[in-house]
Amino acid sequence: MNFQGLVLTDNCKNQWVVGPLIGKGGFGSIYTTNDNNYVVKIEPKANGSLFTEQAFYTRVLKPSVIEEWKKSHNIKHVGLITCKAFGLYKSINVEYRFLVINRLGADLDAVIRANNNRLPKRSVMLIGIEILNTIQFMHEQGYSHGDIKASNIVLDQIDKNKLYLVDYGLVSKFMSNGEHVPFIRNPNKMDNGTLEFTPIDSHKGYVVSRRGDLETLGYCMIRWLGGILPWTKISETKNCALVSATKQKYVNNTATLLMTSLQYAPRELLQYITMVNSLTYFEEPNYDEFRHILMQGVYY
């Protein structure tokens, strides 16, 4: 359905005139609105993923909570956007859910493609630190992102040095009332996420915990440096079992993974991925140590 020209009424009774379609993904279509600072994200209500996003926005992404966390952690920027409004729209046969969210700029995937599919190591390390800061905030609220990738990392419209991790349709609550979810497989959750970057736990049907997001970020940084992961081509065939088995093969062979992917083994990624692979499912990472490792790649 083309929503352009429709007037949507949100939960606060404000109206939004839907403009042209500017993006489409697995978790909804994105349209401009009559306010250039915002876009509207729409999908059928029955799909459920936009409800997951809405719940995450309303429960976790409160500006006051983010600001307080930044001050307490002495971190200048947390790359998470907030939700302006939400609502439902009913057509003749289908009911739709919509969110009104901040309008951002180009995504990192477009930037990488415009740079011959690779970025300088310094840039990759800086991006890695920004995403690490962002997922640390999420993790300390008890949530994992579950789908970190370049197309889900978006530049600010004005300040191109600010990045935002978007698309919260696969967020998982791994902590509740201070208790970690148990290490129990759910066959319905197997292989969630983007196959090339899906963490091994997710392949097996476990809820993505902190180590899963960090694992995915490691795969992403290899790709942003211009590497081709050993399972990149396999993932295009949608052979989930073979992708999972190939990832598992490299868990204790980080140097081989890097040499196979990049033809060299950056010290920072060797240390980062090795440390990720040493984490248990329940363990809280030492984010400062991970930041320190990546920061070395910024200056050396």
UniProtKB/Swiss-Prot annotation:
Give the result of G79D, as annotated: Complete loss of enzymatic activity and loss of viral intermediate gene expression (mutant ts2)
PROSITE patterns named in the record: PROTEIN_KINASE_DOM, PROTEIN_KINASE_ST
GO MF entries = ATP binding; protein kinase activity; protein serine kinase activity; protein serine/threonine kinase activity
Q: What is known about its processing and modification? A: Autophosphorylated.
Q: Which keywords, in A-to-Z order, does the entry hold?
A: ATP-binding, Early protein, Host cytoplasm, Kinase, Magnesium, Nucleotide-binding, Phosphoprotein, Serine/threonine-protein kinase, Transferase, Viral release from host cell, Virion
Q: What is its EC number?
A: 2.7.11.1
Pfam families tied to this protein? Pkinase (PF00069)
The prosthetic group or cofactor this protein requires is: Mg(2+)
The main enzyme category here is: transferase
Q: How does it assemble?
A: Interacts with host JIP1; this interaction increases the amount of MAPK bound to JIP1 and subsequently increases the activity of transcription factors, such as JUN, that respond to these complexes. Interacts with protein OPG198; this interaction inhibits the repressive activity of OPG198 pseudokinase on viral replication factory formation.
Q: What is this protein called?
A: B1 kinase
Which gene is this protein's source? OPG187
